[in-house]
Amino acid sequence: MIDKVYIGLVQKNSTLFGFVYRLGELYRRLPFPSPVYYINRKMAYILQEYLLRHPADVIITPHLYPAEIITNMKKMGMEVPPSIFVATDYACIPFTEETDCDDVVIPSEKLIPEFRKYGIPKEKLYPLGIPTADTGVERISPEEAKRQLGLDPAKEYLLIAGGSMGAGALEEVVEILYRVRSLHKCKLIMVCGNNQQLYSRLQKRYADKIELVGYTDKMPLYLKAGSIFITKPGGLSSTEAAAARIPLIHICPIPGCETKNMQFFKKTGMALAVTNPKEELTAAVLSLQKQENRKKMIQCQEKYVPGTATAQLGQLVEEGKK
């Protein structure tokens, strides 16, 4: 239910989502709990009943809402297993500070001052990074990834995605990149996710001139096959891209946490930030077709997303059980 509301909101009116996010930023300055906290209070009894039937050694939550439920349970005197909140954006999102998980895993040590600013105790903060799955794809060549996807191993591909819901400006982005493609002998792969309307419109306009993909569970292969990845700056999806060591261009951020993700990746050199695709996107693509720029960006990705977060989170869980 929450996912559907979120996806519908950002698909149809990302500006409204940005306004709601800014309201959250303002509300967090007030000296009392947020409506989000009180709404999730009703879920405390449901989670308590679930845990009685399905005992757990530890709860790991990458989302604010379960963290709010756990906080309510603690304040209501309910028994709760050790809990770990994993922040999946490169920012301390509104109301994180009112949660009371035992540990808080954050994407980078560079974000410690921001989380401390909002009152998260330093001893709770673990800058381990955002965990990503080991898919095994990193051990195959780009050519093999292309073959497994039914693509031409000899061709270069520009990979575009808008997250699971697509993004409003993606048609414009495809049009811009299609012109770049025609100049540089590469082909576009457009991952539309669950946005069937976008898929249909692009299929009608471009037919077989670009590779169109709907929802897919083969994103790691596409990241391996692509030469450059153009996408919205989601926290987890951008981390997965950086872990795949693919040159990255951020576009069309949803105002709020995605804007902050874009800023972090730009500042650390892990991605280029394009705020005006018409004026900036072509130059960004051409820049990342230069080998020295690609190499420099991948080195930054290796520095800030070393790929150790999942193992370190597992170690933190084991230590907490002792």
Regions found by a protein language model. Name each.
Residues 306-322:
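C-terminal alpha-helical cap of glycosyltransferases
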